[in-house]
Amino acid sequence: MQTEITAPVSIFDDVGRLCNFGWARGPFFHYDRELLWTPGRLITESERYIIFSPTHLFAFELYDAGALGHISICAVSLLDKAISRKFEKLSFPTGILKLPNQSEETIIKTAINDSLIEFICIEDGGRIIKIDAPQLSHNNRLRGEVVLMTQEDAQSIVTYAPWRRQTERFQLIRCSPWYTTEGVMQFENKPLLFNKGRAWGIYEWARIARPKKDIHYWAAACGMYKGQQIGFNVGYGSADSTAGTENAFFVNGVLHKLDQVTFKISPSNWLEPWHFTSNNNRLEMTFIPVQHNSYQNNFLFYSLRTRQFFGFFFGKITLDDGSLLHFNNITGITERRKTDN
């Protein structure tokens, strides 16, 4: 049985051991890096946003893994399938990105070489993203500002899980796949408008004390279908998800909890359709990739290999009240991330 946490708790007990594993509908788990026993080179802290309009998708990530890290910017044209990106490797970045302990305390301003990124948390759970990146691939420049707005009382999926037989390792992840987005991005020498009701955003926050090897699959999406805003977050990896899986579906900001979800990927061609099913037959979903982004980061004893795919989701979900919801053409992302220390 999964364990729902319904009030604020610490992830440590009185003597510093990990406790209170489970899942929550909000940021109830208190994380403090200063209390960790884990060596700094095994701690990962990251902040990630994916925003998209009917024509373009942009993904921004700040990633600090102790011995190495990166700043990643990816711009995808959903119409002609073109991609432009910037991947800035960071050696020993611990603390440089100044990522906060809590997801609701996000005020981050990062300037690396010629790029400037700002993530700002505002009142009512909204977010502001400011970007100025003049040297993306294909001589493209990306600059602009967008505001991510939330619905009143919108819920998030937050999971806190250990690794089996590794008492000091854990995975704490939050995903909010329901933002509406407004603003302008200047890309390919033309303005791209993000209009409320036609543009969306996904926020992911992660704090992880890693084992030596890990592999993690993830997918998330958001959009409007037949007058309802829907979104989801599904994923799994080598962490012990007995107390709470990452899998949840959202309708107008309300969370509907799922148990296990399986990713079915063609081993010969990852650009073929992906299929998703849940163990209790509540979810059946297909993903159609339109573009692929991959990168590898290696330094001394640590490596990170990531494969991302952007595209559209189709399927059906049985909600918590037993009603059946069909959805089509919802924009999102899938990913496989593998780490090795």
Show the residue positions of the predicted features.
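Structured soluble/peripheral alpha/beta segments that form catalytic or ligand/cofactor-binding pockets
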Residues: M1-N341
